[in-house]
Amino acid sequence: MEKINLKTGRLIVEKYLPHNFLAEKIVLSSLLISSEAIETCLRSLTIDAFYFKNHREIYKAILIMYKKNTPIDIVTLNTFLQNQGLLPKIGGIKVLIELVNQLPNLVYLEEYIRIIQDKYVRRSLIKLGYEAINSGYITNISLEEILISLEKQMFSLTNEIKNQDVFSSVDLFSQILLELKYKSSKPVLAGLSSGFYDLDSLTQGFQKSDLIIIAGRPSMGKTAFCLNIATNIVKKYKLPILFFSLEMSKEQLAYRLLSAEALINPMRLRNGHLNKKDWLKLHRIIKNLSSLPFFIDDTPNLSIQAIRSKVKKLLFEQNTIGLVVIDYLQLMQSSTLKSSNRVQELSQITRSLKNIAREFNVPVIALSQLSRNVENRIIKRPILSDLRESGSIEQDADLVLMLYRDQYYNSNNENDEQLDITELILAKQRNGPIGTIQLKFDANYTKFFDYILKD
């Protein structure tokens, strides 16, 4: 039991603080049978949300194991707790066996989480009330400091309540109104700048939670273009970039990056045929690039689950991610669907990539090959239907960009001025116009530039 001594403001045990033992037990039980349940709890429940100490220890252990990509069931959890010397503190193996025997109904998981969250906020509110009473007796701290401290804690509690997936129209439109006021007061892009003026004008930048497909036939410059974009973003915003290179090694990608940034021919760079001026440029560029949060993963044949785990791990380490890049889509493996029908497998992959973009609130760029049918046409310029043999890319993508270099197919073109021109076709934009822009491509450095350079 708990009550307050009005003279001291101290808490005296008189009754239990709000909690729900069964809801906590069922939620923990769910975590032992479903990775989706862990993700749901990770978004909604802190360790302190659990009232019972042994429940907090179990939940903390599960989160640590999950972040390390350790399989989670009663055996692995028991082993982890034993190794940490925590098994006696949680009540022994019998507590874990009780959780396994609970047989939770996952359909109601979010409701059980809501109950736990509700009790946690109520406990926090009660404790804040006791703190307010105690603070009223303290005279060596200014009243202003006390009120500011209490206000901050109350604001934090309010945020706990509003941390929900369903928004009322009032909250939603109020949020949009604030965003619009900010944008109108400052001429900024709505999303991340690609570094290419005409592309930004059409798209208003890459938006959080967008799946962006950059497609083209081989040798159109997909990797170079995407690497240019990623470099532009990390240099401008200093946000972590995670680049999955499923085709090229990290060394090959690094050479391309250095060549494009230092404007040194990649063959000369690889051969080490560098003059003094080149070396000076190279040292300066390497120093600048080394200070940027640019992360490359060149693990081949990655599954969608592996990519998701690596994104989550980097987010946990860096606290934020600016952009995720996958080069390229057709080299990925499905986590669950093992089918001879590659189209179905690619459909599952693109849907999962869109889910990753939404879950982590980050733009995801995926490079994609186009159908070989392009080569059989007289006019080689790609169209949206060239993606349709690659699963549901067209349906799942928010933006579809296609690269076309006429020089590749018409090397004897008499119009020399057009030889370095690449068409960037914005074939789909879920929330904006489509169109075609022109870029300059310099094959000497595998780098793209604005067709008309902007100040």
Curated annotation (Swiss-Prot):
Residues 185-455 form the SF4 helicase domain. Pfam families: DnaB (PF00772), DnaB_C (PF03796). It is an enzyme of class 5 (isomerase). GO terms for biological process: DNA replication, synthesis of primer. One of its GO terms (molecular function) is DNA binding. PROSITE patterns: SF4_HELICASE. One of its GO terms (cellular component) is cytosol. CDD domains: DnaB_C (cd00984). It is found in: Plastid, Chloroplast. ATP binds at residues 216-223. Its EC number is 5.6.2.3. InterPro entries: AAA+_ATPase, DNA_heli_DnaB-like_N_sf, DNA_helicase_DnaB, DNA_helicase_DnaB-like_C, DNA_helicase_DnaB-like_N, DNA_helicase_N/primase_C, P-loop_NTPase. PANTHER family: REPLICATIVE DNA HELICASE, REPLICATIVE DNA HELICASE DNAB. NCBIfam families: DnaB (TIGR00665). Homohexamer. Belongs to the helicase family. DnaB subfamily. A replicative DNA helicase, it participates in initiation and elongation during chromosome replication. Travels ahead of the DNA replisome, separating dsDNA into templates for DNA synthesis. A processive ATP-dependent 5'-3' DNA helicase it has DNA-dependent ATPase activity. This is Probable replicative DNA helicase. It comes from Trieres chinensis. The lineage of its organism: Eukaryota, Sar, Stramenopiles, Ochrophyta, Bacillariophyta.
